């Protein structure tokens, strides 16, 4: 069940997960995802973020800010 709310009541901006890139963190506990911002001044922008916890394509996240992006994953 998706409940849309104003930014001032929850304190975030809705974003839809469009791709799960991979795992990051010391033990692989975080996922790097690409998400499309659904509301606010950056509406429609696709950004890369790190996310902790289970996430899959189509999930809706509430982002506190939409201007910050995660660095791209690198392999060693």
Swiss-Prot record:
PANTHER family: 40S RIBOSOMAL PROTEIN S28, SMALL RIBOSOMAL SUBUNIT PROTEIN ES28. The gene is rps28e. InterPro entries: NA-bd_OB-fold (IPR012340), Ribosomal_eS28 (IPR000289). Keywords: Ribonucleoprotein, Ribosomal protein. HAMAP family: Ribosomal_eS28 (MF_00292). The keyword Ribosomal protein applies. One of its GO terms (molecular function) is structural constituent of ribosome. One of its GO terms (biological process) is translation. It comes from the Archaea. SUPFAM superfamilies: Nucleic acid-binding proteins (SSF50249). GO terms for cellular component: cytosolic small ribosomal subunit. Pfam families: Ribosomal_S28e. This is Small ribosomal subunit protein eS28. The keyword Cell membrane does not apply. It comes from Methanosarcina acetivorans (strain ATCC 35395 / DSM 2834 / JCM 12185 / C2A). Belongs to the eukaryotic ribosomal protein eS28 family.
């Amino acid at each position: 069940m998706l409940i849309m709310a104003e930014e001032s009541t929850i304190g975030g901006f809705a974003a839809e997960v469009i791709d799960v890139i991979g795992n990051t963190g010391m033990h692989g506990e975080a996922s790097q995802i690409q998400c499309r911002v659904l509301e606010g001044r950056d509406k429609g922008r696709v950004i890369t973020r790190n996310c902790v916890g289970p996430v899959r394509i189509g999930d809706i996240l509430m982002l506190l800010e939409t201007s910050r992006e995660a660095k791209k994953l690198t392999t060693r």
